[in-house]
Amino acid sequence: VGAALALGYPVLLPDGDGANNIYAINRVASHVILDSMRMVHEQHDFPLAKSHFVSLGASHGGMMTGYTAAEQPYYAPDLTAYVNQFVVNEGAPDLIKLAHSFGLYGELQNAPSVYGSFLMSFVVGAAREYPDLLPHLYQWFTPYGKAVVKGNRSICTPLTFAVGPGVPIKNIVKEGFFASQTFKNMLQIAKYSSSFYYPG
């Protein structure tokens, strides 16, 4: 950001997580990014109506940017002539494969995972954006899981650190969660949010 500003380029910083933390809900985040670009063209305070864009994201920003690249031709075809490039750094395109590799579920779900906190952040965002698919989600949390979510659910970084490293996933959700319809719906939401499964 600093380098771009030093070179005289305007910088747009859309909040893809939103005020209430929708971590890794990338379809929604992609609309935030694309609508922000449209806003740049439509506002009248600065002479930017014909501005072109380079969209850059790393880590979670990379996931959002990758999904935005897939979604843009369908959701915002009016921006095609103005988006020069999407640059993705460390943006996982497949959240389900990522969860497997991190041991968030599957064979390693009983082992301590330093990434359990990221699962919680995703779960909170999914519950907020897809309540129709997850009507019974919170009944699957253990007392520990409920306490962590209640105290930190509206702020991404504290939620990430609140669970902390070395906490087995079984301490967060009750036995049977991974065989439940709620979990199956969660996998579907993960597909919705993964550019690897993008239907376009």
Indicate residue ranges for each PLM-predicted region.
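Short amphipathic alpha-helix adjacent to the substrate-entry channel of hydrolases
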Residues: 1-11
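Short beta-to-alpha linker loops that shape the active-site pocket of alpha/beta-hydrolase fold enzymes
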Residues: 10, 15-19
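Alpha-helix capping and helix-loop boundary segments enriched in small/acidic/polar residues
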Residues: 20-31, 56-60, 178
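Short, proline-enriched alpha-helix->beta-strand connector loops that line the catalytic pocket
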Residues: 82, 197-200
